Every structure is written in C-alpha cells, then in structure tokens.
C-alpha cells in the first residue's frame, strides 16, 4: 500500500477513475452513490451517552439524530452558528449543521461547506431551488433533502448560512491509500462502512471511502477521519488530468480551480475534498443532473 501525501491528489484520483473511461454507468458507480438497502433500519437507542475524542460534550443516539439540532461536539472550532445552521426552522427547514456538521465539515455523503465562496454557495442553493442541480440517482436522500431545503429556506436564511460557512477555514480529514485489496463494506446511512470482519475484496475501478472510526462518524463528529482506498496508479493518472488535461481528454482542473485547486471568489476549492463526493459531482455534470451556472465548464 502507498499513502500519497499531497492534498491535490484527492481531486486527482476521482478524475483518474472517471474521465478516462468516458462511459461510466450508474451500476459502475455504486461505490460513489451508496444507497441504503430496502430493509435498512437505524440502530435502536439504548439511552447511553455517546462520547468522541477531545470533546466534553455528550449526546444520546436519539439526540444526534435530531434534524433540528446541530450536534456540536467542538464549539470552539467555529464562531456562533446562525439560528438556521444550529436549529433550522420547524417544520420544514432542518438545521444545516445537522447534515453538514456544526462547522460545515460534512462527510462522504454530502458536501464539505467549510470555506466555500459566498457567491458559489448562494448560486448552488438557487440551482437546487430551480431544478438545475439534481442528482443522477433520484432516490438518494442527501441531495433530495438539499432540494427540499432550498425551496423552504428564505433568501435571508440562505444569505446568513452562506456567510457563516464561507467564513470557516477549510481542513481535511482524509488520507489516501493506493491498494489492490480493500476491506469488505456495507452501505449504512448513505455511506460505505467497513464490516470489521477482516475480509477483503478486489478494489477494481472503485474508490472505497470509509470512516476510520464508524462510531465517531455515526455520532456526527466533525473531526471524524476517513480513509480513501484507491486503485494502484489512479493518483498519478488523475494528477495528469488535473494538471494538463491528459493530452486533450479533459480541461485541466487548474484552469478554473486555480494552480493549487483552492478555488477563487466564485469557484469552489476541490483540494482535499471527499473523492466520493467529487466523483458524484463529475458524473452529475456529465449526465446533465448538474446543469446550473458554470457546470458546463
């Protein structure tokens, strides 16, 4: 196994897997669009208080599932949350910080909002509202919640949410491992989870992104860390696409997102982001599910 150390590689490997094939189908991308099985059920709450590292807070499992209360394990990580981020607005605007975490860190199932440009954030909410931004898998809940939320949030709520998340400094919680074999996984809560059985399987042409500690992730800890297992050689292939476009197969990512992939005042950073999330966005642009402003670029 090899663990690359450069943050731009997170974007590179998603590009390396998606762009060269040119004909990825939804079945091929099940790893990027994890779907809960029909018989999926949440674990029951035994009433015990959950803890995460480096936090004095404690929550029951039921409390971490309250969509009208951001689970804030590390209040010192961020400035005071706007009301709509912390608690939403009942009955139909969930707390933004519940899905995306109090400091916007998100997870493989959704977007990391930390440091997104204000103008870009507002435009994405407009695109969700207008129907210009959807998902290639219509029944996928995280995007469905965003579409619903965009239609019930007021412009003022979107404005203060965008200002809050754009003020936060981005950080990464992901390490990349190139390997031919990966742990066996199941889908739980719209993400892949290591079964913990010790069994392995061939990675094929997939990215397998899992939480290092599933309990911390389930507790909605914004500091929960992740591993992205990627096929051998995918990082170098992706890096070529990111930097040069690989002899015309793609526009170099740096053309729009900047030489260090940290974005601009209107274009989002892609450095250090979840490769599963990036893969979904690339595929959604390709299929036309993302057709909003700048998507064609």
Set out the residue ranges of the language-model regions:
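N-terminal secretory signal peptides that target proteins for export/translocation
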Residues: 1-6
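Bacterial N-terminal signal peptides
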Residues: 8-18
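Sec/Tat signal peptide C-region and signal peptidase I cleavage site
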Residues: 19-24
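Flexible coil segments in periplasmic/lumen-exposed cytochrome c-class electron-transfer proteins
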Residues: 25-94, 136-252, 287-297
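Gly/Gly-Pro-rich "capping" loops immediately C-terminal to redox-active cysteine motifs
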Residues: 86-97, 101-134, 138-153, 178-191, ...
């Amino acid at each position: 196994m090899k663990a690359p150390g450069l943050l731009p590689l997170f974007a590179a490997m998603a590009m390396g897997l998606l762009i060269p094939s040119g004909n990825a189908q939804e079945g091929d991308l099940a790893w990027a669009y994890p779907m809960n099985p029909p018989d999926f059920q949440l674990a029951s709450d035994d009433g015990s208080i959950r803890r995460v590292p480096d936090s004095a807070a404690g929550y029951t499992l039921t409390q971490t599932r309250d969509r009208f209360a951001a689970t804030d394990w590390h209040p010192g990580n961020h400035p005071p949350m706007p009301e709509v981020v912390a608690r939403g607005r009942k009955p139909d605007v969930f707390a933004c910080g519940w899905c995306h975490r109090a400091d916007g860190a998100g997870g493989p199932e959704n977007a990391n909002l930390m440091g997104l440009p204000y103008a870009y954030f507002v435009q994405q909410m407009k695109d969700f509202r207008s129907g210009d931004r959807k998902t290639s898998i219509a029944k996928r809940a995280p995007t469905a919640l965003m579409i619903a939320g965009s239609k019930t949030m007021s412009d003022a709520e979107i404005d203060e949410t965008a200002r809050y998340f754009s003020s936060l400094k981005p950080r990464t919680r992901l390490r990349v491992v190139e390997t031919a074999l990966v742990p066996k996984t199941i889908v739980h809560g719209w993400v892949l989870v290591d079964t913990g059985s010790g069994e392995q399987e061939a990675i094929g042409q997939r990215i397998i992104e899992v939480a290092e500690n599933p309990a911390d992730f389930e507790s909605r800890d914004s500091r929960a860390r992740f591993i992205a297992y990627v096929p051998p050689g995918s990082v170098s292939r992706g890096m070529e696409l990111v930097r040069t476009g690989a002899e015309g197969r793609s526009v170099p990512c740096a053309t729009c997102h900047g030489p260090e992939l940290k974005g601009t005042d209107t274009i989002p950073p892609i450095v250090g982001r979840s490769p599963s999330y990036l893969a979904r966005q690339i595929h959604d642009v390709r299929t036309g599910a993302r057709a909003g402003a700048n998507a064609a670029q």
